[in-house]
């Protein structure tokens, strides 16, 4: 039996090994073991691995080891899809170079003031980490000179493609000097990413790491079919009976995050909203409060939650089901980190069962249904908490003055048990310890395509035209938007408004056709009513969309298809399919990232309970 390989065996310099040792790690993860020697030897690397595999250290350790601190210009560039990931990578790099005198790291992302970034660049940062949009802005402004760059890393390349940043990535790559080393990491390898590897990489060494199910996050998943009570009441019930440290609740819209937060605060939960309207400073303050325990719940949209990596989160509630299955996977990945177990709860409206089936199909496993906690469950939970509260108070030794008060009460010729019961009634506050029975509810009718012991003919899904993967057709509805060419609108404006306001992956937006006074757009069937109401108020170029339903799309051929390049192919001559730039300048970073932590080296170094790297 061969001995385990350690970081000391990989050829890393002493100052890097010392930093790694300080972090408490000895054994490299599979991707680190494979990539580090290649990058130290000057080879380009194409890494295919899921998040949580330790790829940040896989590229950062060998490349940082080769930085020359005496050269005060950018030598290493890391592009990440979100500002959260960029910050995490930069933080990790800071830890890795703690013993490298003179190595400076700067982070460039939208939402942060330019003067802060300019000051860091002028101080001679050798390592630049940022989002594609802000990096390209600095290049065009002449404030970022990459003429002497030695290393470039594309982290989460498929995410940058999915978010529409691939054009910016290629533009930046074209600016680099001829002799540089490239490392590209991606969980999947769609054709546009392959194209980049062929165009910009020199005989890359491919490293493929399979997910180790033994190290997969321990997440207990369940769903509740919305029935009998409103989601708000159900949410309060579930939160009351769930045993969680911290929780994140996902809503589909910014307005939803505010409404849910207001509901929770009124009912005694320490909560805060997290959405795209927040400044970066306020966002970071909110996440810091969640980390240090002064906040227990954040209510977030998918966009705002990207990049959250907080060990305390042990519960994820999908208040609104995501319209694409991949978003669900990334949502629940916020819990079950660092070897801890987690819970994920999904609310499913009657019209959303198809979306649930899509999620189960992607995950290759079913999600068990859970019953709404009834009055007996709530009552028992409240009583246990109340008894625990009283027991804890009895441990204090400063109760003597209250004993004298009891003596006064007992001499009032009142039964002691009645006095104690009256005290309990006063102490219970708003959360009553004795609850009336729930009103009877009609039994939920199981539909033909509902869950359980259904046996579905495989051809039935084909007849429904459901989407089986990227680029496959799915049932669509046609909508009209009261904004058109005369208003100066372009397809990218429509896509951006729908994708950002509804947190909808742009690939799930169908054929868009522009007319002079209005626009038609195809969206997946089963869109929640609340979301459509939100779209009606959404503004495009400062004009309300006033979205209205026209009917179901009758033929798949009438609908555009999409490829991984984000380009739409439709029959209408008025349809312009370029999707490469459907975003605002300063919000590029506020996108999607999910770093699942495992017991090897997760991408965000931790300071506790480490056994391996």
Curated annotation (Swiss-Prot):
GO molecular function (one): RNA helicase activity
GO biological process, one term: ribosomal large subunit assembly
Swiss-Prot/TrEMBL catalytic activity: ATP + H2O = ADP + phosphate + H(+)
Motif Q motif, chain ranges: 5-33
Gene3D superfamilies in the record: 3.30.70.330, P-loop containing nucleotide triphosphate hydrolases (3.40.50.300)
Residue span(s) of domain Helicase ATP-binding: 36-207
Residues noted as binding ATP in the record, renumbered to the chain: 49-56
InterPro entries named among the record's database cross-references: CsdA_RRM, DbpA/CsdA_RNA-bd_dom, DEAD/DEAH_box_helicase_dom, DEAD_box_RNA_helicases, DEAD_helicase_DeaD, Helicase_ATP-bd, Helicase_C-like, Nucleotide-bd_a/b_plait_sf
Region (Disordered): 434-476, 552-613
UniProt KW keywords: ATP-binding, Cytoplasm, Helicase, Hydrolase, Nucleotide-binding, RNA-binding, Stress response
GO cellular component terms listed in the entry, alphabetical order: cytosol
First-level EC class: hydrolase
Residues spanned by motif DEAD box: 155-158
E.C. number: 3.6.4.13
Composition-biased stretches (Basic and acidic residues): 440-469, 556-613
SMART domains in UniProt: DEXDc, HELICc
Localization (cell): Cytoplasm
Domain named Helicase C-terminal: residues: 231-378
UniProt record similarity statement: Belongs to the DEAD box helicase family. DeaD/CsdA subfamily.
Physiological role: DEAD-box RNA helicase involved in various cellular processes at low temperature, including ribosome biogenesis, mRNA degradation and translation initiation.
Protein name per the record: ATP-dependent RNA helicase DeaD
Species per Swiss-Prot/TrEMBL record: Haemophilus influenzae (strain ATCC 51907 / DSM 11121 / KW20 / Rd)
Gene: deaD
């Amino acid at each position: 039996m061969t001995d385990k390989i350690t970081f000391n065996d990989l050829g890393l310099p002493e100052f890097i090994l010392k930093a790694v040792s300080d972090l408490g790690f000895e054994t490299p993860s599979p991707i680190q073991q494979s990539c580090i020697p290649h990058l130290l030897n000057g080879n380009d690397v194409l890494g295919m691995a899921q998040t949580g595999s330790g790829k940040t250290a896989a590229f950062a350790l060998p490349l940082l080891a080769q930085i020359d601190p005496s050269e005060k210009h950018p030598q290493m560039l890391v592009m990440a899809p979100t500002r959260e990931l960029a910050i995490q990578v930069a933080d990790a790099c800071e830890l890795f170079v703690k013993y490298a005198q003179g190595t400076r790291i700067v982070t460039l992302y939208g939402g942060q003031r330019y003067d802060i970034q300019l000051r860091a660049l002028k101080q001679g940062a050798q390592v630049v980490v940022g989002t594609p949009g802000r990096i390209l802005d600095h290049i065009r402004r002449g404030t970022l000179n990459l003429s002497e760059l030695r290393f470039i890393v594309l982290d989460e390349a498929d995410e940058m493609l999915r978010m529409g940043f691939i054009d910016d990535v290629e533009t930046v790559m074209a600016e680099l000097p001829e002799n540089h080393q490239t490392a590209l990491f991606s969980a999947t390898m769609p054709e546009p990413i392959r194209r980049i590897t062929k165009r910009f990489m020199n005989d890359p060494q491919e490293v493929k790491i399979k997910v180790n199910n033994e190290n997969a996050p321990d997440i207990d998943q369940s769903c509740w079919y919305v029935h009998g009570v409103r989601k708000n009441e159900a949410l309060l019930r579930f939160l009351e009976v769930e045993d969680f440290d911290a929780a994140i609740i996902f809503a589909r819209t910014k307005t939803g995050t505010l409404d849910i937060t207001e509901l929770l605060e009124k009912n005694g939960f320490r909560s805060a909203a997290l959405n795209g309207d927040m400044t970066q400073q306020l966002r970071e303050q909110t996440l810091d409060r969640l980390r240090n325990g002064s906040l227990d719940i954040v209510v977030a949209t998918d966009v705002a939650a990207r990049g959250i990596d907080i060990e305390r989160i042990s519960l994820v509630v999908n208040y609104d089901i995501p319209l694409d299955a991949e978003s669900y996977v990334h949502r629940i990945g916020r819990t079950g980190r660092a070897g801890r177990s987690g819970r994920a709860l999904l609310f499913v409206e009657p019209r959303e069962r198809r979306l649930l089936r899509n999620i189960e199909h992607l995950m290759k496993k079913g999600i068990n249904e859970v019953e709404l906690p009834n009055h007996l469950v709530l009552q028992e939970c409240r009583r246990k908490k109340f008894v625990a509260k009283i027991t804890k108070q009895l441990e204090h030794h400063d109760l003597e003055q209250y004993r004298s008060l009891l003596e006064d009460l007992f001499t009032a010729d009142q039964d002691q048990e009645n006095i104690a019961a009256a005290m309990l009634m006063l102490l219970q506050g708003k959360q009553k310890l004795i609850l009336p029975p729930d009103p009877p509810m009609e039994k939920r009718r199981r539909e033909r395509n509902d869950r359980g012991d259904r046996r579905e003919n495989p051809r039935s899904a084909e007849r429904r035209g459901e989407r089986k993967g990227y680029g496959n057709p799915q049932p669509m509805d046609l909508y009209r938007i009261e904004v058109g060419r005369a208003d100066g609108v372009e397809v990218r404006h429509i896509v951006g408004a729908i994708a950002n306001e509804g947190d909808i992956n742009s690939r799930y937006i169908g054929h868009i056709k522009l007319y002079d006074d209005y626009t038609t757009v195809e969206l997946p069937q089963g869109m929640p009513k609340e979301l459509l109401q939100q779209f009606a108020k959404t503004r495009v170029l400062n004009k309300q969309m006033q979205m209205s339903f026209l009917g179901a799309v009758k033929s798949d051929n009438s609908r555009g298809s999409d490829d991984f390049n984000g380009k739409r192919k439709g029959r209408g001559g008025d349809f312009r399919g370029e999707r490469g730039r459907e975003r605002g300048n300063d919000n590029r970073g506020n996108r999607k990232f999910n770093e699942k932590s495992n017991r090897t080296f997760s991408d965000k170094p931790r300071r506790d309970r480490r056994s391996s790297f």
